[in-house]
From Swiss-Prot:
Biological processes annotated in GO: protein unfolding; proteolysis involved in protein catabolic process
Residues given in the record as ATP binding sites: I18, G60, V61, G62, K63, T64, E65, D247, E312, R384
The protein's assembly and partners: A double ring-shaped homohexamer of HslV is capped on each side by a ring-shaped HslU homohexamer. The assembly of the HslU/HslV complex is dependent on binding of ATP.
InterPro entries according to UniProt: AAA+_ATPase (IPR003593), ATP-dep_Clp_protease_ClpX (IPR050052), ATPase_AAA_core (IPR003959), Clp_ATPase_C (IPR019489), HslU (IPR004491), P-loop_NTPase (IPR027417)
Protein name per UniProt: ATP-dependent protease ATPase subunit HslU
Pfam families linked to this entry: AAA, AAA_2, ClpB_D2-small
Record-level GO cellular component terms: HslUV protease complex
Lineage: Bacteria, Pseudomonadati, Pseudomonadota, Alphaproteobacteria, Hyphomicrobiales
Keywords assigned: ATP-binding, Chaperone, Cytoplasm, Nucleotide-binding, Stress response
Summary of the function given for this chain in its UniProt record: ATPase subunit of a proteasome-like degradation complex; this subunit has chaperone activity. The binding of ATP and its subsequent hydrolysis by HslU are essential for unfolding of protein substrates subsequently hydrolyzed by HslV. HslU recognizes the N-terminal part of its protein substrates and unfolds these before they are guided to HslV for hydrolysis.
Family: Belongs to the ClpX chaperone family. HslU subfamily.
Length: 434
């Protein structure tokens, strides 16, 4: 797990997300608290519970983006789900315990990648031996092998085609048993056992020497790793460092005046309660305790209010953060300051066609103005409006770019207004086009 300080986490998030200081601070403190808890000993470590977060704010202001960037920073198992995808236990559909099962799968992948790095050097040597076997056969003399080894290391054999045998980890069928969530457990374990009993299946692949290395290194790494140890480590990492991000939580809040609990509304909230509070979920790798998993939830709360959530669930999301709507200045900064801003993306895309794009300052102002106006008059969809506007402005250039290699286009305010000004003024039209 990464040990960034809260200040470092916030400055890292600042590279990609404009504004929203409160939300960044809240997630930075929550992430740092995971690390602080790891430093504690014994009973106190068990007692410290994560403070779950509820992010409230209109669509397109950075709630989901904060969680995505946080996951990359954390170096911890992270799963993002939409609350609307789940139904109450006992009904057709996914139940919320599937979130934890997915988290464990992600943790196993993470741990395996880390362990593979540790044994990479030895795996590389073993892979080289297998490539030599494929090139000159196992019975070749040491002198022949050495001469081919030199050629291999010099890259002279990179394009030669060889046949290699690799273990076949063909995806085993994953059957859900109706009425028994998570009952695909049995099927997978049976196929695992059959694989072990038969000494593991292998399949032959044709590939070039250069392309065979990554495949063989992975294959050899897995032979050097203890799978049971990986699973045990992954279960521990899931329990201690796991982060679950639940988006669209406002969509499962009971609407005012609505009747009935609703299978995918209040029922899902009731199922989430024990998960957020701390329970034990059965997975095919073993039981996972959710006491120390950090839950970050977010919602726009356009129709419902946070107080429409079940009181018990509200109590389990003690940290509330409001994200503010974006201003004209925010839009300007999104276009110019973020590390992979839309403008930089379009310039890079056009460079592949040898077309040069240049945006003047007044063009950026015009784009920001139009985005703000449309959000105010049509529907507020936050920063996503910029994608719609820029796409419309650059439509002609994108279409004709292959025929204009070597050309330079300067986008200024006049060009923006020419392409989009009329549409933006006509509210009825812009409802459909922008």
């Amino acid at each position: 797990m990464s040990n960034f300080s809260p200040r470092e986490i916030v400055s890292e998030l600042d590279r990609f997300i404009i504004g929203q200081k409160d939300a960044k601070r809240a997630v930075a403190i929550a992430l740092r608290n995971r690390w602080r808890r790891q430093q504690l000993e014994g009973q106190m470590r068990e007692e410290v519970m994560p403070k779950n977060i509820l992010m409230i704010g209109p669509t397109g202001v950075g709630k989901t983006e904060i969680s995505r960037r946080l996951a990359k920073l954390a170096g911890a198992p992270f799963v993002k789900v939409e609350a609307t995808k789940f139904t109450e236990v006992g009904y057709v559909g996914r139940d919320v315990e599937q979130i934890i099962r997915d988290l464990v799968e992600i943790a196993i992948t993470l741990v395996r990648e880390k362990r593979r790095e540790d044994v990479k050097a030895k795996a590389h040597l073993n892979a080289e031996e297998r490539v030599l076997d494929a090139l000159v056969g196992k019975t070749a003399s040491p002198a022949t092998r050495d001469s081919f080894r030199k050629k291999l290391r010099n890259g002279e054999m990179d394009d030669k085609e060889i046949e290699i045998e690799v273990s076949d980890s063909g995806a085993s069928p994953n059957f859900e048993i109706p009425g028994m969530p998570g009952a695909n457990i049995g099927v997978l374990n049976i196929s695992d056992m059959l694989g072990k009993a038969m000494g593991g299946r292998t399949k032959t692949r044709k590939t070039t020497v250069k392309d065979s290395y990554p495949i063989l290194i992975n294959d050899e790494s897995d032979k050097l790793l203890d799978q049971d140890q990986i699973v045990q480590e992954a279960l521990r990492v899931s329990e201690d460092e796991g982060i679950v991000f639940i988006d669209e939580i406002d969509k499962i809040a009971a609407r005012e005046g609505g009747s009935g609990a609703g299978v995918s509304r209040e029922g899902v909230q009731r199922d989430l309660l024990p998960l957020v509070e701390g329970t034990t979920v059965a997975t095919k790798y073993g039981p996972v305790k959710t006491d120390h998993i950090l839950f970050i939830t977010s919602g726009a709360f356009h129709v419902s209010k946070p107080s429409d959530l079940l009181p018990e669930l509200q109590g389990r999301l003690p940290i509330r953060v409001e994200l503010s709507a974006l201003t004209r200045e925010d839009f300007r900064r999104i276009l110019t300051e973020t590390e992979a801003s839309l403008i930089k993306q379009y310039i890079a895309l056009m460079e592949t066609e040898e077309v040069k794009l240049e945006f003047s300052d007044d063009a950026i102002d015009a784009l920001a103005d139009i985005a703000v106006d449309l959000n105010a008059t049509v529907e507020n969809i936050g920063a996503r409006r910029l994608q719609t506007v820029i796409e419309k402005v650059l439509d002609e250039i994108s279409f004709t770019a292959p025929d204009k290699a070597g050309a330079t286009f300067i986008i200024d305010a006049a060009y923006v207004k020419e392409k989009i000004g009329g549409l933006a003024k006509n509210t009825d039209l812009s409802r459909f086009i922008l």
